[in-house]
Amino acid sequence: MTASWGTLGHLWNKDVAIIFIRPQRYTKEFVDESDTFTLSFFNDKHNELSYLGTKSGKDEDKVSNVNFHVEMVDGNPTFKEAKEVFICKKIYVGKLEKEHFLLPEIYKKNYPLDDLHYVYIGEITDVYANK
């Protein structure tokens, strides 16, 4: 999955990554099944990342179509081509709620199908950098 909604910060005295995943995303199954998730950052590869963001791994082997190479880091999948990889331990999962939106136009613009994102907060436990 290519993510564009997320943030890094400090919460509950921990360095954290906060990510948002829609319920219909294939990636959600994998994140839900594991206690950890990875975030992979790239210097370039914009065309490849755009392709990955518009295709589902449920329908095709999209990773091989962009010639990325999966590798395991501390038992977690990432890509050899990534510049940096964050290993995150899940510490919170919740779902956005329609009634909590204070600006109705945000909800209307982003959720016409009422498919509200799930929020995952992960403690950043390791960071790896490729040279």
Regions found by a protein language model. Name each.
Residues 1-131:
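Active-site-proximal mixed secondary-structure blocks
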